[in-house]
């Protein structure tokens, strides 16, 4: 899929569901370019008025619009159109994303073990709760929390950005309701002269309530913008087994997840995988496009607690979860490493 040429920009009004659409060309979104001479990446900047991503699901920091290695591309909008009326993603021709899911690259969502954001259960309608990386959000009613509802952003916190030629650091400081407050720093770094990107997270609990959450990295991988199909392979250091019916779209062979055919139309693949252990070494996910001969291996430094794989024809998206617990006055750090490579041709001995 070619990167989307035009994207609809959303301006959120004070009432939660009053949304206006306005058209912007891609260059209108605030961004910075990173390069280490091997990798080249475009990183979008958080901006409440003009930012590429302004939903209430994912962390606003670290949204990557593109990354290139040896003439291969890895990230870019997986959706072909944007519609604020769409709850999540409408799969078809075209693929249409709603405001909370219209993201690009590796993006993180913080979600509690109960499936809700911090402080949502305690908050009454009209009061605020806490979505790390987004802000203090207003609870609309007594319905169950949903990542796909666009809650009004009452306070986006204090944000700052620092950057150099091959790195960028985002910081958000925020006090939410129910005693939650934090300082959250994310650093994206391209290692010198290596095809490696590192994302480092640092969360400091500055509030009175303990932060007990899970966070998953939603990796929207559109390698070379080619159709998801038999050439798209996801592999692991363990033998996984699917906990849901894959609907005839996928199969597991040993340590690999394969797609049975080209996904098309409204085909949607999703399953959660079991089989990983309690060691961080199992957080190693390899995604390859064996048609274009490009791949990436994603490693985390914490044990997996859940692992989902979502795919449509334009994207393959591993969703690995880890647990984060931070007592008041304490801090937590975690890291993801992305190593990019070219897939060897049959008969070659190793990746490059």
Show the residue positions of the predicted features.
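Positively charged n-region of N-terminal signal peptides that target proteins for export
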Residues: 1-6
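Bacterial N-terminal signal peptides
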Residues: 8-18
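Surface-exposed acidic/polar loop and edge beta-strand patches at domain peripheries
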Residues: 22-198, 209-212, 218-352
């Amino acid at each position: 899929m070619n990167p989307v040429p035009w994207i609809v920009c959303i301006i959120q009004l004070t009432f939660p569901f009053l949304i206006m659409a306005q058209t912007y060309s891609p260059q209108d979104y605030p961004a910075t370019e990173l390069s280490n001479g091997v990798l080249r990446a475009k990183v979008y900047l958080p901006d409440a008025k003009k930012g590429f991503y302004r939903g209430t699901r994912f962390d606003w920091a670290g949204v990557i619009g593109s990354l290139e290695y040896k003439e291969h591309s890895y990230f870019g909008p997986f959706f072909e159109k944007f519609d604020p009326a769409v709850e999540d993603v409408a799969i078809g021709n075209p693929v249409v994303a709603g405001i909370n899911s219209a993201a690009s690259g590796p993006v993180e969502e913080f979600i509690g073990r109960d499936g809700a954001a911090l402080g949502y259960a305690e908050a009454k309608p009209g009061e605020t709760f806490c979505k790390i990386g987004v802000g203090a959000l207003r609870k609309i009613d007594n319905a169950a929390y949903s990542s796909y509802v666009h809650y009004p952003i009452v306070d986006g916190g204090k944000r700052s950005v620092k950057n150099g030629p091959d790195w960028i650091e985002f910081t958000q400081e925020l006090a939410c309701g129910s005693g939650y407050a934090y300082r959250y720093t994310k650093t994206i770094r391209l290692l010198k002269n290596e095809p490696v990107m590192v994302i480092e997270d640092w969360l400091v609990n500055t509030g009175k309530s303990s932060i007990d959450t899970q966070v998953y990295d939603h990796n929207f991988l559109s390698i070379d913008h080619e159709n998801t199909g038999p050439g798209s392979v996801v592999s692991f250091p363990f033998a996984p087994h699917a906990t849901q019916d894959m609907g005839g779209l996928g199969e597991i062979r040993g340590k690999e997840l394969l797609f049975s055919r080209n996904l098309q139309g409204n085909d949607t693949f999703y399953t959660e995988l079991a089989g990983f252990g309690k060691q961080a070494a199992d957080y190693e996910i390899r995604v390859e496009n064996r048609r274009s001969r490009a791949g990436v291996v994603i490693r985390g430094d914490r044990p997996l607690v859940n692992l989902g794989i979502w795919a449509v024809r334009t994207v393959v998206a591993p969703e690995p979860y880890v647990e984060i617990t931070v007592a008041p006055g304490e801090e937590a750090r975690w890291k993801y490493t992305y190593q990019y490579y070219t897939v060897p041709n049959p008969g070659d001995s190793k990746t490059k």
